[in-house]
Design a protein with these regions (language model features):
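A residue-level marker of the well-folded mature domains of exported/periplasmic proteins
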Residues: 1-272
Length: 272
């Protein structure tokens, strides 16, 4: 069985039953978090930490010169939009972007950890993160609720601070936060006009998000690989059926821009 569980609690009895019958279950897409021990033999899903890390690398490349020259008097602030602080996928994406950006700044600029500050929602600020620097600030934002209204309100509040707080980049870790930013910016059209130079990077591939990428309102976005998710899930299930050893598979992610979104290896991944 290949299973994408929106609510693990809703399938607990079925998982226990399948396990008692020695029927292997493979989790795919979001996997099956908190499943009964041993009931899921492997998962085929996106490594969300790594996928968001790719976004951090692209953000750094776009802002490298400004990050290098950042000072306490003229800092660079990058804001990460996370729709909530509970879901494992969003937690992994926020943390992956955060840690990759911190590590990249330290590795590729004169700045040290003492120059960097990670701040914001406590779920996204870890004990190993630098929290006292004043040259590069990574702000982890979460709306009051995951509703579209509150997500848009969060986006608008951050946009109101772009100039005053030297906000240079925004990463949106899912389609919901992308929609919030687009709602606050006339589907992105206000970004180049009102916030010139602000780098926006999204995640996933809804119709409005793809239009924002195509129109170059966004630098680009991260897409998962639904083909590989399905293919690897079936492959793992078949191996498990045959009694072969199986392990979790990272199905990968890609960064798409206005330049490559019509390429054969990308366009099939970003359907509406």
């Amino acid at each position: 069985v290949a299973l994408a569980a929106l609510d693990t609690n809703a399938v607990t009895d079925q998982l226990i039953s399948l396990q008692s019958q020695n029927i292997p279950v493979v989790g795919f897409d979001s996997g099956v978090p908190d499943a009964p021990p041993g009931s899921i033999v492997a998962n085929a899903s996106t490594n969300n930490f790594a996928a968001a890390g790719l976004a951090a690398e692209k953000m750094f490349e776009a802002l490298e010169s400004q990050i290098r020259s950042a000072t306490a008097a003229n800092p660079v602030r990058i804001v990460v939009f996370n729709q909530d602080a509970r879901g494992e996928s969003l937690l992994s994406r926020g943390r992956g972007f955060r840690d990759t950006l911190v590590d990249t700044i330290i590795a590729r600029t004169p700045h040290t950890a003492a120059d960097i500050r990670v701040m914001g929602n406590p779920a996204f600020v870890a004990s190993h993160n630098p929290t006292t620097g004043n040259k590069v600030i990574i702000e982890m934002a979460v709306p009051a609720s995951s509703s579209a209204q509150d997500t848009t309100a969060m986006a608008q509040a951050v946009l109101n601070r772009v100039r005053g707080d030297n906000i240079k980049g925004i990463f949106m870790s899912n389609e919901g936060t992308v929609v919030g930013l687009l709602a606050a910016t006339d589907d992105g059209a206000a970004l180049p006009a009102t916030y010139p130079g602000l780098i926006a990077i999204g995640f996933d591939a809804g119709r409005a998000q793809k239009a924002a990428v195509r129109n170059q309102y966004f630098l680009g976005s991260i897409t998962q690989d639904p083909f590989q998710i399905g293919f690897q899930a079936v492959n793992l299930a078949n191996k498990a059926r045959l009694g072969q050893s199986v392990a979790d598979v990272d199905t990968g992610a890609k960064f798409y821009t206005h330049l490559n979104m019509d390429d054969d290896d990308i366009k099939g991944l970003i359907y509406d």
